[in-house]
Amino acid sequence: MSIEGVLKEGFVTTTADKLINWTRTGSLWPMTFGLACCAVEMMHAGAARYDLDRFGVVFRPSPRQSDVMIVAGTLCNKMAPALRRVYDQMAEPRWVISMGSCANGGGYYHYSYSVVRGCDRIVPVDVYVPGCPPTAEALVYGVIQLQAKIRRTSTIARQ
C-alpha cells in the first residue's frame, strides 16, 4: 500500500514526539505569580478581550495543577525562595514565562539592594516578554512562542 492509499483511507501518520507535543501545546495551565503591575496585564490577557482560553491556557490556582509559571513583576530577595518553592512543586514538564522588565532583569529597580536582577537567577526561564508593563498582546505572543518552543522540543529524549 502506498502513502496515497494510506491517506485516502483516512489514516494519519506521525511520531510520538509530535503527538505528545501537540497535546501539550493545546493545554497549557499557568500558575500565576503576580508580583507587581505586570500582573494586571496578565489578568487582562485572561479576560474576555484577549481570552487566553482559546489557546488552551487555563489559569490554575495550585502549582500541582500547573505546567507553566508566569512571573509578572519585580522579584524581591524576600520572594525568591517562595518562587523557587512554587516552581519545585510544579509537575514535569514545566515551563516559565518571565513577564516584564522587572522580572527579566530588575527593570526600573535594577540597582536596588532588595531586587533580584532577573528571575532567571532563581528558576530557568523559557520565554521572556519585554515591556514595562508589557501589554496583554505581548503576553499572548509570548504564549504562542512557548507553544512553538514546545513543538520543537524532543519529548521522549527530554531530561
From Swiss-Prot:
Biological classification of the source: Bacteria, Pseudomonadati, Pseudomonadota, Betaproteobacteria, Burkholderiales
PANTHER family assigned: NADH DEHYDROGENASE, NADH DEHYDROGENASE [UBIQUINONE] IRON-SULFUR PROTEIN 7, MITOCHONDRIAL
Localization annotation: Cell inner membrane
Bilayer-crossing regions: none
UniProt membrane topology term: Peripheral membrane protein
Disulfide bonds: none
Keyword NAD: yes
Gene label: nuoB1
Family to which this protein belongs: Belongs to the complex I 20 kDa subunit family.
Residues binding [4Fe-4S] cluster, per UniProt: 37-38, 102, 132
Protein name listed in UniProt: NADH-quinone oxidoreductase subunit B 1
Organism name: Burkholderia mallei (strain ATCC 23344)
